[in-house]
């Protein structure tokens, strides 16, 4: 529509009179408003009916059109008048288009502002005039009347007012047509104008910010639709706005500047094309130096990238990569925001999981606890939505966090995995494939029970009861769940679950004992006993400090409330059912709830206790259900295969489960049906199944004889048969079962003992093992009845016929250890014979005869002879290892009885201790574990803890680490025992860990490796052993323990060695070890020189009483020795040696005892030198099989020369690095030189020492001679290193002893003297 060129208002032709439509009188200000309205309606009708082609009418009513734009109408106070005038004006613009009848710009502006104001009437759809308002809107939109305003200089004011009006009036009562006309009107202005000003843009965008969006949802929708429709036109304006605010920082350009990030999010959701020019600006903002600004951009982009159906990450890879970089932002809130975003991203965009995985991995190790926590939440939430959204790596991050140092993170990880397990493994919500993907969760959750924290243990118990085997299930379903869970668990998880039940049962026992004390009359002793029980119970609850106070309060309530005591008694009663248990817990909790408090920590602590002791899984009904499941597996009618286990596995695991439960819930087994099923198991071919069944009878069958005679009559012959001809384990259990459940046990045992004792035949060792087991256990359980016949059997058969004869020749394959199924029957019989001797003595537990003394000499002699008691050389190396282990274990077992410990001589103790340095890895490993278990249970005397000091000499890093852990555990157990038991203070000599030092010093002084007390290398070895123990003991200086240790060692220097008081050399060794100990203590502690409040007591068995006239203030360590002990380095005097000798010179490392290892060349050398694996890298997960390899099959491997050896390799220091493995399992190989066959055999060394570095510079001959030098390593044989082809060394040198070996051979020749002493 164009404007006429005339500057003045157009006048009608003629006399200037206004022509009104037919029937319409003149409209002036002289008439009433009602009359004006009446006449205007007719005018409106006239204009409505006119069209653009009516030229005559247009001319006729032109004056009227001009009149309607007068002040009278435009400023009329009556809204009906104004509405009708607006409708007329809209029609006038339609009719006269494209030339408007109004030529004044001011008049036009006034008219359009007037029309815009009338549009406000659209707000009320229920108004009688709404149709006219709608007509006005429709007319304006259809004609695009507002486009006339483009020619006005200040048209923006009109458009802003129009947009504001339309956005303000729209509401949910408007239909689609109203919205469409509004859109048409506004979009035409935007699309046909020269551009959108910032003010006009603000009127649109303001409707998108959250505050306005929530106030008027329809205005928000209108703005969205408008922007979508005009995207091509308005994008440039939007880009300009954001450019000024984001890049140029001109926040004053708009009042919406502070809402830019909200607007970007909304605009992106409307159409990403609106922001096509804005996104690069965000990348710039992501790199801002202002942390808060980066955080705001990250929050925004997180929403954009994470939005459903968003393709921003694929469309804008640079921005995506830049955003991912913020996962490593220095600002904690930014990293936190990124992690939170990852959850939405994983759920909405699984394809981006790969990009996120690496960044989440780094954040799972973030130093900030909240971030590690949120990583877990992110992954678990995605996994709960769909397991396919999280890959194995992401789940692995959660698994790692179960061991986080922070409890909150550990808890989140454990609970999250438990929820996934319940959803996908228990309820199978996503099929078997998903269940298989996370089948590891059950094992890893139970493994957490191994952690020391009580919080971890309690959470595992809670998870087990709620997620793994939900206690809310019906009994049959619950037991099916437990049955197959137990069958699928790995070994460590099974042990953890067993330990969990054991701990709960122990706690039930403590509560039962506490209730029993309440039944006794009040006394000081009773109160003290109660206090002890409460302290032990508190240790099994979270936050033991608070738990002690709450348990005291709970105990007080128990004393006052008899009903509460009765309910607690019912809860821990062996006959309490699961349903009764839940009811009891509710009742006890309800009683303790009053008075009600918002938080009641006392009640929470009691709940923890009740949850641990309540039997929510196992009762008689549950055991019956388990037995039925077992029967189905045996019959082949169970769902074993569907549950992912074979029937055999299900049966074996089911029996093992019942066996464990028979310890903790024996009463629940007492039913004929259960025992009938167990009898069927006894008849099965699977030895493990039968063994478990016997053990269940043993644990639960105390009432069988009186209440179930039919079961008794069937069971007795089966037990007899198992004791005579079953496996060794079955025989043991059968004998114990008879002893436990039958009243006439003497008769029953005699019926087994007599035929077995008559049928012993050493020539058929295969048939000897089970009888020896049965006889040993019978003699232990019924010593009075069988002591006399057993003495005869021991003397005539066990010792003379079996142990002192070698009937077969062992396999000379050179291995130091073989698998259990490869051990010869004769050796197995000999091992059982040694165990029989021990059981026989344990049964007697007295020393009235000389049986104990003479019997003890036998394992001692076995150790002296290195396992070859007859010394006929018939027995193999691996069999000798087995017998040494049996002999050492026998002395350990007997030492646990006070009566036998008293008669074990210091020499026998030293022999027993040296087994921990045996040359065979498995002997050291098994022996150390037996020693640790007995010590940690406080069964062995304190002196045996000193044996762990010798582990410093173990060449295998893992064995040293294990020994250190054992020491830490033993020391903490003893310290805790002293704290918890007031009576323990009377036995400090046998409990206080510091009192191990005198035993350790004495043991090291008698170490066969200490041949030359002033030898610097030997002194360094002594220091390593002392430091191995003292480092752990001196971690804390509790009660001035450092000065106590110093005084103890100084006191030892004022005594003599009780083992050989008149031997000056022996005493000198003792004093030198003392000086080394004092040196170590002084270097470790700055407070050791303070006065000790206590005077240490020394063991009279090892030290003479101090002589008051004897003052030993001599220093036995030279200045050079002190430097060596301080630095760990031995200065070697320069010697003229050949090139190879100089290259192969041994080096040492500070503070680490050097071990000579065999270094294999690239072409390989023959068998191993010693019993450590050649490479520490292969020892991380050691098992028995890793110790046995092809190299061990060679008794006398041929030494091959290397084709070429790099000079650098030859120069590798002997004591610095462990050699690379020549092959798997060189650990237990024995190598020797075939050319050495003509050499006279060396005296047998004491076993198991790691090889020593040569004191002087290594020469070619020393290196080569290591092969035959059995004495060089004190029982350790070395393989020759690869030889350089240029070397002139002759292989004859291999048969020569090294100088060190020659020197050490002399004291070894005195070894037989020790044997004579033992046999006196």
Swiss-Prot record:
Where in or outside the cell is it found? Nucleus
**Which one GO biological process term can you cite for this protein?**
DNA repair
Record-level GO cellular component terms = chromatin; nucleus
Composition-biased stretches (Low complexity)? 1255-1267
What SUPFAM superfamilies does UniProt report for this protein, alphabetically?
A: ARM repeat
Q: Do you know which InterPro entries this protein is assigned to?
A: ARM-like, ARM-type_fold, Pds5
Looking at the record's lineage, which domain of life comes first?
Eukaryota
Q: Which UniProt keywords apply?
A: Cell cycle, Cell division, Mitosis, Nucleus, Repeat
Describe where the HEAT repeats fall, as residue ranges on this chain. Answer: 156-195, 272-310, 388-426, 709-747, 990-1028
Q: Where is this region: Disordered?
A: 1158-1320
Q: Where is the composition biased (Basic and acidic residues)?
A: 1180-1194, 1294-1309
Biased composition of type Polar residues is found at 1158-1179, 1225-1241, 1283-1293
Q: Where does the UniProt entry say this protein principally localizes?
A: nucleus
Summarizing the function annotation, the protein's role is:
May regulate sister chromatid cohesion during mitosis and couple it to DNA replication.
Assembly and binders: Interacts with the cohesin complex. Binds chromatin in a cohesin-dependent manner.
Assigned protein family: Belongs to the PDS5 family.
Protein name from the UniProt record: Sister chromatid cohesion protein PDS5 homolog A
Organism in which the protein naturally occurs: Danio rerio
